[in-house]
């Protein structure tokens, strides 16, 4: 039986205004957009709050050149420069030992470019190692969600190889051979002290 309106027009079912069921994307509980720096800052805040270790991110020294004062109570920096090259990202104390490390991340999936490091950082880390400090590098491969703890004494030969005209990157296989993988967790986010415990204590 056909259904019609009083004015003679035929009824046509309309699907407008009816919400369509959308297919939900699978939920992933991975990194959710956090950077390596965010993860490490959360981790060291946890260590400090739990009285486990005292580690800080070093501020980069800046030389302010020009300041604008639009109001008496506010100032706007118009021009500034980095004073000196920074050494490493983080330093602190754990179980009476000085620790110093650099953290880098890459979007590459098969290798890490050594151009992410600088001469002054390598010199600084080598000097800390000479003084018996615990020195290491944390490298995150963001696309594959893997993060590695590499003792500096095992990372430095890759830098020396590049300086001698060799490869300008380190393959992920080479990194896996000399490192300890840091799993992601909730609290702490990246428990790199487990790697320190395993390798140094």
Swiss-Prot record:
Reactions it catalyzes:
Endonucleolytic cleavage at a junction such as a reciprocal single-stranded crossover between two homologous DNA duplexes (Holliday junction)
Chain sites annotated for binding Mg(2+): 87, 89, 102, 121
Q: Which co-factors does it depend on? A: Mg(2+)
Broadest EC class? hydrolase
Q: What is its EC number?
A: 3.1.21.10
Give yes or no: UniProt keyword Flavoprotein.
no
Q: Which UniProt keywords apply?
A: Cytoplasm, DNA damage, DNA recombination, DNA repair, Endonuclease, Hydrolase, Magnesium, Metal-binding, Nuclease
Coiled coil spans: none
Task: Identify the CDD domains for this entry.
Answer: RecU-like (cd22354)
Please give the superkingdom of this protein's source: Bacteria
Co-factor remark? Binds 1 Mg(2+) ion per subunit.
Task: Give the HAMAP family listed for this entry.
Answer: RecU (MF_00130)
Q: What does this protein do?
A: Endonuclease that resolves Holliday junction intermediates in genetic recombination. Cleaves mobile four-strand junctions by introducing symmetrical nicks in paired strands. Promotes annealing of linear ssDNA with homologous dsDNA. Required for DNA repair, homologous recombination and chromosome segregation.
Which family does the entry's similarity section mention? Belongs to the RecU family.
Q: What is this protein called?
A: Holliday junction resolvase RecU
């Amino acid at each position: 039986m056909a259904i019609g309106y009083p004015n003679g027009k035929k009824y046509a079912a309309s699907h407008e205004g009816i919400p369509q069921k959308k297919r939900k994307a699978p939920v992933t509980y991975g990194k959710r957009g956090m950077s390596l720096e965010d993860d490490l800052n959360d981790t060291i805040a946890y260590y400090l709050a739990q009285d486990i270790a005292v580690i800080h991110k070093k501020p980069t020294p800046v030389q302010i050149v020009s300041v604008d004062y639009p109001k008496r109570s506010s100032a706007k920096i118009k021009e500034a420069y980095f004073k000196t090259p920074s050494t490493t990202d983080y330093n602190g104390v754990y179980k009476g030992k000085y620790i110093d490390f650099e953290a880098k991340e890459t979007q590459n999936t098969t290798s890490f470019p050594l151009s992410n490091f600088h001469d002054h950082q390598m010199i600084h880390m080598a000097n800390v190692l000479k003084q018996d400090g615990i020195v290491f590098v944390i490298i995150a491969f963001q696309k594959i969600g893997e993060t590695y703890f590499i003792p500096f004494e095992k990372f430095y030969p890759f830098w020396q190889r590049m300086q001698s005209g060799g490869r300008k990157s380190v393959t992920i296989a080479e990194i896996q051979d000399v490192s300890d993988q840091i799993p992601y967790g909730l609290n702490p986010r990246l428990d790199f002290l487990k790697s320190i415990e395993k390798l140094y204590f």
